[in-house]
């Protein structure tokens, strides 16, 4: 790749799909399901979040990604994983998503791992909401980033 001379062998993927984990899935089409399965991506649906609790899910997620190493971790947080009750300003609003506390817990656990190297938070769109929803979504997005980068209550 031009500009990425440190990638000596372009045949080796930069990110292995088996090192990815999705949390909070609840609305997938057949193609998305097939894609996730075919690449061996670890995925936890909202059913599993409800069944095991977000604490156990995050324990399994971090064990899968980090194992017993301190490798760098990238968190990609899609705000539409959160229930629209808490974050309505997004293009894909599907009821039954992560609760306010579950979303924050994910970010807090990533911060506690000490391995966060980078983060993106996507799908925040303040133009797609009713009165007040834009502020709730933006405030939550800022809070999630703050939590993931180590801001804590104490």
Regions found by a protein language model. Give the residues of each.
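Conserved alpha-helical scaffold segments that buttress catalytic/binding sites
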Residues: 1-154
